């Protein structure tokens, strides 16, 4: 099954603010969510247990960036993309 990937406008702004190389790396990893957005053996995707009824996934990208996303039926909604440092500051306990 292929998934449609939708990216929040703020996440797009962040991606566009990166260097060409970083932008290509981020885009490549986000496009890979079309094929398989669920956590697996690679360890780059993780289901976060925040609270009941909230299902958020985290994608580590090249040890430099983190994307947070949700999956609804056949659509992946990328809500945020940020540096790993920003993610650690914003989501300390995850």
State the predicted function of each range.
Residues 1-3, 53, 94:
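Extreme N-terminus of proteins, especially the signal/transit-peptide cleavage junction
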Residues 1-31:
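Arg/Lys-rich, positively charged N-terminal/basic patches that mediate binding to nucleic acids
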Residues 20, 31, 35-38, 92-93:
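Generic surface-pattern signal
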Residues 13, 24, 61-94:
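Enriched for short, Lys/Arg-rich terminal
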Residues 32-59:
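A short, surface-exposed loop/turn module that caps and links secondary-structure elements
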